[in-house]
Amino acid sequence: MRNMTRWSALALVCVTVALGACDRSSPPGSTTATTPPASPPAAPSSGVRLYVSDETGGNVVVIDPEAASVVQRIAVGKRPRGIRLSRDGKELLVALSGSPIAGPGVDESKLPPADRAADGIGVVDIATHAVVRKFQSGQDPEVFDISPDGKTIYVSNEDAAEVSIVDVASGNVVQRISVGEEPEGVTVSPDGGTVYVTSEASSDVAVIDTKTQKVLARIKSGPRPRSVTFSKDGATAFVTSETAALVGVIDTAKHKIASTIQIPKTEGTATPPRPMGGALSPDGQQVFISLGRAGSVAVIDVASRKLVRTIEAVGARPWGIAVSADGSKLYTANGPSGDVSIVDLATGKVEKKIATGGSPWGVVVAVRK
């Protein structure tokens, strides 16, 4: 499906966060699209590519957004969720988990035992689309981020209420740090000095000092914080609060909530917004927040810290979200409907929906330069 031209460079535009009504779950009452089998590894051609983790299919789905088509499926392992490009753009990293999916109200004692051997961070070579390594990760890895120098990975371990620190050179966990209950979102500050970790059940954000590898502060957030997105200068961080329909604005110098942004329900709709994933525009002026069951995306102005518009009817429960390198397109992973939406940011309208099958969770944009 692709020729043997090698990508000379890639850029991570944005990534994030999650797909599921709660921690380890698919949304109640949702249907999961059938996942086609993975295709064999092939070298990618030039142009923009979307890499989408498919939690129920065990694949990373490769999409050509211009052609609006799936061009490959890379089999990576069980429950791929969090997904990022390496800092040098040569590899794709994806969190894999052997924990069974537990929907709301499910008695977890009746689920099959977790397959801890399946836990890890899978590494895919961008040039060949082959899985080349698997890092240790701690239990049930969900979301992770990479240090600016690319040498360290910070992983949320939901089952263990910990963050694992992974040395990229060895692929081993070198430290574990206790954080709040049900940690999910993990974001490294632009200067690499701190890591912000959201804890859903504790309703707080743990701030980890990367030098001491200790928690230096805990920021009380709104209920069920899901993700953190830093401003370009790192002075401000935006934390989503799922069940309060708000975004907290954190002063990172003080490690405190400075203000909150309430996301109103769309008039005439019964479904409240559920702030989930976040992505910063390339120029750093706006933050895009996926609103889950509301099927929309909130747009926040970084300078004024205000909601400036809401993009409606994006897709079924958008969560994972990313922005194109030129800032003209927005991409959302819509788990219940098994597709990815491409939004024209000039018009605020969905241009295309690309069927992925399975349950798309996170999305990464890679571009050839």
Task: Go through each PLM region and give its residues.
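Bacterial N-terminal signal peptides that target proteins for export
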Residues: 1-11
